């Protein structure tokens, strides 16, 4: 395994012995606690050859797509001395150097990243992400902490989202192939999604779509949790199997609509379809008065 590592913040006031035994994750040394935690500084790091980002701390990440690699950190001396950044097997890892993070300043740690492409973002900490991702093939988002994708546009062929924490996606997405979502936490999609292909959603948590998911193709949804969202489907199939609470509006221009309701299902369906089938085994309220079934 090839590893390139930068030991950040080797200030004159911090001896090399303060950074020993990194793998054992000892508590923050007093030397680090005594560093300046008011003046904000910025450091450039010689890190390159990565296509993925993995975060395990509380941080803001600003990403710019560029032909050249660059990584820099911005924060107080005290915060930077506790951050550890390294590239391992193509992944830029952002983590704590010590067992705990000591910070008496309100200024958040920031990382500025430039790279030709990013196809994976993994978060186990508290991450605010800013930046456009123009990826021709795929993008995989994995979250087990608190993740806000605050600003930017995603353009990709295939997108997968696996969430076991709190995930807010505030930016639009343009997907040319397919979208797969597995949610076991809290997931909010607060902007439009356009998918020119298929959508597969498996929800076991809380899932909200505040605007609309536009699909040219097919959608398959299994819901065991709480789901609230709107779809616009032009294509083949829309199928939902609900075992939890499912509240949705569907604007359809498709071949087939199938609803299996084993929980609480509340839907308004408008537009046109060639066929609709409803299997009512729960508490079901589906309004199809504005739906035209074509002969």
Where are these regions (language model features)?
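Intrinsically disordered, low-complexity terminal regions
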Residues: 1-295
């Amino acid at each position: 395994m090839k590893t390139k590592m930068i030991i950040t913040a080797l200030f004159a006031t911090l001896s090399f012995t303060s950074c020993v035994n990194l793998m054992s994750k000892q508590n923050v040394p007093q030397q680090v606690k005594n560093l300046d935690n008011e003046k904000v500084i910025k450091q450039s790091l010689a890190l390159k050859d990565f296509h993925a980002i993995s975060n395990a701390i509380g941080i803001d990440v600003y990403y710019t797509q560029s032909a050249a690699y660059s990584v820099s950190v911005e924060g107080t001396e005290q915060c930077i001395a506790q951050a550890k950044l390294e590239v391992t097997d193509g992944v830029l890892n952002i983590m704590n150097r010590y067992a705990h993070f000591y910070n008496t300043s309100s200024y958040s740690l920031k990382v500025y990243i430039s790279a030709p492409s990013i196809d994976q973002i993994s978060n186990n900490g508290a991450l605010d992400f800013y930046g456009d991702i123009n990826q021709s093939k795929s993008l995989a988002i994995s979250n087990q902490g608190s993740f806000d994708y605050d600003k930017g546009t995603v353009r990709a062929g295939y997108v997968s989202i696996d969430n076991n924490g709190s995930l807010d996606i505030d930016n639009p997405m343009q997907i040319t192939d397919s979208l797969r979502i597995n949610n076991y936490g809290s997931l909010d999609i607060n902007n439009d999604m356009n998918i020119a292909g298929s959508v597969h959603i498996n929800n076991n948590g809380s899932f909200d779509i505040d605007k609309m998911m536009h699909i040219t193709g097919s959608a398959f949804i299994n819901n065991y949790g709480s789901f609230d969202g709107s779809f616009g489907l032009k294509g083949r199939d829309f199928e939902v199997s609900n075992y939890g609470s499912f509240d949705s509006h569907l604007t359809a221009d498709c071949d087939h609509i199938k609803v299996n309701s084993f929980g609480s299902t509340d839907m308004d369906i408008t537009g046109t379809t060639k066929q609709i089938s409803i299997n009512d085994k729960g508490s079901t309220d589906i309004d199809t008065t504005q739906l035209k079934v074509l002969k």
